[in-house]
A protein has these predicted regions:
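Long, compositionally biased
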Residues: 357-382
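Short, surface-exposed loop/turn motifs that are enriched in glycine and acidic residues
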Residues: 269, 311-319, 349-361, 365
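Structured, contiguous alpha/beta core segments that scaffold functional sites
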Residues: 1-317, 323-324, 328-332
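Short acidic alpha-helical/loop segments enriched in Asp/Glu that coordinate divalent cations
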Residues: 295-297, 335-348, 377-382
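Active-site lining segments that contact anionic ligands and/or coordinate catalytic metals
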Residues: 332-335, 363
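Short, catalytically relevant binding-site loops at active-site mouths
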Residues: 303-306, 345-350
Length: 382
């Protein structure tokens, strides 16, 4: 008698039936929609962080035979027990032709004609990493032949992709009619709460596991995430809000112009309007324009009092507060603020010029290298 194969018993999704929407797919139960995260990604500081990291990745998207230069390589997979170059398998002439084909395939977006409107490797990477750094969801369609050989790939809007209920044992039976090659579809494109139908065929736009490249950087065991990741922007919601409030507060200073340095209080209660108008005109002629800056006015016959509205150092506190928020935003994305061009005097004073270089290298090892490894693993998988 054949013994039953052991299976995993644990669950990955919210066990409550409340999370089941009956539409065939799961939404990320985070409280923030993908559209909200995309709008946050368009805010200047977040966009600067994301674009900077993507531009750094671009340096590694050209094929390189030199281990010391940035770029990617195509080689035989090495066994865990291999040591150094002595166990590295040399490429034959046939292998080199295969490498040339793979490089061309990547850089042209698949087996496309010259004038097909498909992305090259650099453009493709910009799109999928932008989604990953905003939504923590990288998605791209993979087109294969009948024998499942790779033919094309195309970046897909990650905000439209949802995980189907097919890998939830409670609802998998609903999809049995779609089983193919022993697998059920795993992802679908969703718009306005409904799975999209193809405009030509009328079929649901659903993807089997080998038809959609799918990558999550910040995976979690939290069942309330419903199998989705956790975007950095979810962590930064309050920080980004405070940055916007600070910028709005400072912008209103120039927009409304209602923050004078102080007031002149005329103490003479019985002064006539003519004298007051004459004083106002003399003051304007004597003190206005840049040429009269720092002049000392001399006034006779009028008892005046200056009420200063800028006796405190709130401006300095405001600057430090915004600086602190920017540092927090960069820290969540594992990036040093100096990579964005922010040169803080206190940091330069502490670390010096050599220390600054070490900080940049450390920042790239902490943020750029893990992103490259993640991207490499996703590309190799599909």
């Amino acid at each position: 008698r054949k013994l039953p194969q052991p299976e995993i018993k644990s669950i990955l999704w919210n066990p409550s039936e409340i999370g089941f929407n009956g539409k065939g797919y799961r939404d990320p139960a985070t409280g923030f929609s993908f559209n909200t995260l995309n709008r946050m990604g368009d805010i200047f500081i977040i966009k600067s962080i994301i674009n900077t990291r993507i531009e750094q990745v671009q340096n590694y998207l050209k094929y390189s035979n030199d281990d010391q230069k940035p770029g990617y390589q195509i080689r035989y997979k090495q066994s865990p027990g291999s040591v150094g170059d002595k166990d590295k398998k040399e490429l034959s002439d046939k292998d080199k032709k295969i490498v040339d084909y793979i490089v061309k395939f990547l850089e042209e977006g698949g087996e496309n004609e010259k004038w097909d409107c498909e992305d090259n490797f650099q453009e493709f990477t910009r799109k999928v990493l932008n989604d990953s750094l905003r939504l923590d969801q990288m998605c791209f369609e993979v087109v294969r032949s009948r024998d499942l050989k790779l033919k094309k790939f195309r970046a897909v809007d990650g905000a439209l992709i949802r995980q189907l209920d097919t890998n939830d044992p409670r609802y998998a039976q609903m999809f049995e009619q779609f089983r193919w090659h022993g697998y059920l579809p795993r992802y679908a494109m969703v718009w306005d709460g409904q799975i999209i139908r193809h405009p030509v065929t009328g079929e649901y736009v659903a993807f089997y596991p080998w038809e959609l490249g799918y990558g999550i950087r910040n995976k979690t065991t939290n069942v309330f995430k419903n199998g989705y990741g956790c975007s950095e922007l979810e962590t930064l919601v309050e920080i980004v809000t405070w940055i916007l409030w600070g910028m709005q507060y400072n912008g209103n200073f120039f927009k409304q112009g209602s923050q004078p340095k102080g007031f002149i209080n005329v103490k003479n209660g019985n002064i006539d309007q003519g004298t007051l108008n004459e004083f106002r005109q003399d003051w304007k002629q004597t003190m206005s324009t840049v040429y009269n800056s720092h002049k000392i006015p001399v006034v006779q016959g009028i008892d005046l009092e200056w009420i200063d509205l800028q006796k405190n150092n709130r401006d300095m506190e405001f600057t430090e507060w915004v600086k602190f928020l920017l540092v927090i935003a960069c820290a969540v994305y594992r990036m040093d603020p100096s990579e964005l061009g922010f040169q803080f005097e206190d940091a330069a004073r502490i670390f010096g010029q050599e220390g600054q270089k070490e900080r940049l290298d450390h920042s790239k090892q902490k943020g750029l290298t893990p992103l490259l490894v993640f991207y490499q693993n996703v590309i190799n998988k599909y």
